[in-house]
């Protein structure tokens, strides 16, 4: 379960204007799903989301119900939470499953939190077992905890591995996140002991041990930490990411 990274080749200089909204509204009225799909596919997801947010509620509902129009997961996660919730009410369970299967776990949890309870079990039961169990575990924690914020897609490497072993593993393993800037280093108990930027791995000799190139982990986020405490931690220590650990200090995710 991972959001495919396609945005790098999308236009980021889209000029938003009311005239384009009028065109999109007209295409919705004419059931021209192909035009909208093609237009959105050429834009950065944030721009497509901006257009959807500027439509009237009735036009958004009509857009979602158009035949042959499926909202791109990359666009969906760019929408503000209130619009996401509104759109979810107009989507079938199958459509929600299709979106969730292509999202990182933290985004999937955010969506499931807004799904009516009676539909949640149907959606979860339609997901692959591995994804379903991971999401159920996150949902078992209180809403305002780190567990609901964390991403379960991360890259972890044993501290006794060499740089060469690590590079070979990263090349061969198909289940890793498609993009990552930081690698977590773990001991034999899967406790995080450090981090290494992926760029440093690529520039270090193959026989170098990962333990010698890592920066030791200073701050770990308990899985049940309140999300306000997490936010303060990131702000106070200027963090870009942090390891999330369970009660046994095992690495279970990242924020």
How would you name each of these model-derived features?
Residues 2-255:
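Hydrophobic packing positions in regular secondary-structure scaffolds
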């Amino acid at each position: 379960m991972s959001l495919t990274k396609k945005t790098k080749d999308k236009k980021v200089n889209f000029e938003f204007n009311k005239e384009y909204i009028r065109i999109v509204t007209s295409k919705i009225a004419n059931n021209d799903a192909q035009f909208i799909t093609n237009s959105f596919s050429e834009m950065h997801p944030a721009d497509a989301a901006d257009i959807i947010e500027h439509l009237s509620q009735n036009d958004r509902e009509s857009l979602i119900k158009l035949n042959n129009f499926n909202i791109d997961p990359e666009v969906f996660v760019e929408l503000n939470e209130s619009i996401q919730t509104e759109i979810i009410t107009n989507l079938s369970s199958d459509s929600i499953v299709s979106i969730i299967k292509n999202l990182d776990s933290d985004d999937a949890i955010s969506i499931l939190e807004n799904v009516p309870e009676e539909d949640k079990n149907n959606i979860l039961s339609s997901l692959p077992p591995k994804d379903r169990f991971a999401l159920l575990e996150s949902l078992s924690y209180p809403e305002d905890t780190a567990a609901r914020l964390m991403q379960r897609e991360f890259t972890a490497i044993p501290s006794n591995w060499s740089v060469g072993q690590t590079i070979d593993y990263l090349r061969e393993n198909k289940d890793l996140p498609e993009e990552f800037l930081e690698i977590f280093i773990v001991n034999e108990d899967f406790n995080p002991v450090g981090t290494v930027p992926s760029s440093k791995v690529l520039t270090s000799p193959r026989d170098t041990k990962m333990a010698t190139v890592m920066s030791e982990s200073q701050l770990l986020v308990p899985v049940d930490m309140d999300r306000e405490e997490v936010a303060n931690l990131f702000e106070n220590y200027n963090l870009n990411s942090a390891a999330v650990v369970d009660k046994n200090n095992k690495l279970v995710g990242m924020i």
